[in-house]
């Protein structure tokens, strides 16, 4: 008779540890929700008393490191390996010595109270206030010792000898180990000398992750242990990462560049010019025209105002000299190159005009049109820069927008300057 595979029911024997049973990462078996058995607890305490490190105990007994540390800390504080609720358990009677001392006090003074026994234990130096048993624990111990001779419970009456054997085994498991753990001494901070720091910094500049041979050589040369050297490199890398993260944070402080340099003015009447010229506070490098503002009639004449920077060297800046125009009673300014002051600002010639505020673009266009038609253009506005002749196209060329109000440089006025002039384009 052929049996189809679809009709066969799969056989599953179950997991090796069913229910609450689990296997930890070390391969040890534990039952979730139940405390560790007492014989393993006692073995943990005995191995710790023999000087075995908790991490080695954890690997050998296949118990988690947290469980080992918790058992050792509780035994060090209370002297008991019995399990209890974390944070809510009552202090256990610490050691058999304390139990025997309580029995002696009870036998010597039968009417003594539990709080008096606790006070006498602290006064005698048997325990301190931190690990002294509570009053309720002492009372529970006294009741247990007084009723240990006869048991009036149903199990005690009916159990007979079996109950006594079980109690002996249970008492053997619950017996506290008579060992004394050494208190952990906190290691003092290592103070490095200047020579040690210099040697460590030299190696750190070469490599941030030295190998074991480099660490051993460095430990021998500095007189430190290899572990201290390794910890120093770890701390030094952390400090370097913190410094790099601090430097990468962008600073939101405003820049110190100011594009509005204060123009310097010199009072000189402008002949045949009843309009007020607009001022250009900075020469645009990108070719865009900036907004024009009238300084109350006293304006700068097309001068590039550089940003006020922190350079305090002797910078080349236009130096203006006054010259008398022949045939007229007016003065004009000629800009030449010389060694200027410490700041890199470029003051240029300006004239005090009648205070005619520029209200609209139409007024400006009409004023420039009238000035171009009358030809009343002062030479210091454009000619003071002494542009080369090849800079502007001929006047007859198409597209020459400067020809309407550009004049050639007067040779006589150029000879009156105190220093040789150079072309300055303001770019």
Swiss-Prot record:
One Gene Ontology CC term in the entry: nucleus
Bias (Acidic residues) ranges: 167-176
DNA-binding region, residues: 19-145, 185-244
Pfam family, one: PAX
Region named RED subdomain: 97-145
GO molecular function: DNA-binding transcription factor activity, RNA polymerase II-specific; RNA polymerase II cis-regulatory region sequence-specific DNA binding; RNA polymerase II transcription regulatory region sequence-specific DNA binding
Entry keyword set: Developmental protein, DNA-binding, Homeobox, Nucleus, Paired box, Segmentation polarity protein, Transcription, Transcription regulation
Function statement: Expressed in segmentally repeating pattern to define the polarity of embryonic segments.
Protein's name according to its UniProt entry: Protein gooseberry
Organism of this sequence: Drosophila melanogaster
Gene name for this UniProt entry: gsb
